[in-house]
A protein has these predicted regions:
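N-terminal secretory signal peptides that target proteins for export/translocation
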Residues: 1-4
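A solvent-exposed, acidic/Ser-Thr-rich amphipathic alpha-helical stretch
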Residues: 27, 31, 49-54, 58-100
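A short, structured loop/turn motif at beta-sheet edges
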Residues: 96-104, 136-142
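Bacterial N-terminal signal peptides
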Residues: 7-18
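A short hydrophobic beta-strand element
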Residues: 101-113
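Low-complexity, intrinsically disordered terminal/linker segments enriched in charged
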Residues: 143-161
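Exposed beta-sheet edge and beta->alpha loop/turn motif
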Residues: 111-138
Length: 161
């Protein structure tokens, strides 16, 4: 017995829709972004460029505003500079949320600046701040990221009297 094409389409549409919108698991998402966050830790400073390249697509961009984005190589240079100015920097993944191919990471950065830090001289004081990052993953690699860190709060903490 042959089914009319329209009946076949009606029958398989729910299956195709569920496959197209299937979310990656939290574990897969965490594994995809983990090398990037590892790269933000002073302990892995010598490997940070390779770790960032491992986690990102060649044309990945990281945006700190709607229209202010940096290329992968610019981010690698920025991370290297940050790790020099905060030689004990640690960055932990605190929470991971997944929606389709978007991964939101709530993170926490801590460190003690040893060089100029957002225009302030080192004081010997440490900071602890939250970060929120939204990454789009394709093929297990980050292709676009939006991020917010509380750097004003960090400066307040290291300059507090």
């Amino acid at each position: 017995m042959k089914l009319p094409l329209w009946r076949l389409l009606i029958a398989v549409t729910p299956l195709l829709t569920s496959l197209a919108s299937a979310e990656m698991s939290t574990e897969v998402a965490r594994a995809g972004v983990a090398p990037f966050y590892k790269a933000l830790n002073a302990e892995f400073a010598t490997d940070s460029a390779d770790l960032i390249r491992q986690a990102t697509a060649p044309d990945w961009v990281s945006c700190r505003g709607n229209d202010v984005c940096n290329s992968r190589e610019e981010v690698i240079a920025g991370v290297a500079a940050r790790l020099k100015s905060v030689p004990d920097l640690t960055w932990q993944i605190k929470d991971v949320l997944v929606s389709g191919n978007q991964v939101t990471v709530r993170g926490e950065a801590t460190g003690t600046p040893a060089a100029e830090f957002f225009g302030t001289a080192p004081t010997g004081k440490s900071f602890k701040v939250m970060s929120i990052d939204v990454h789009t993953l394709e093929g297990g690699k980050m292709v676009r990221s939006y991020h917010i860190e509380d750097w004003i709060g960090a400066v307040r903490q290291v300059t507090a009297k």
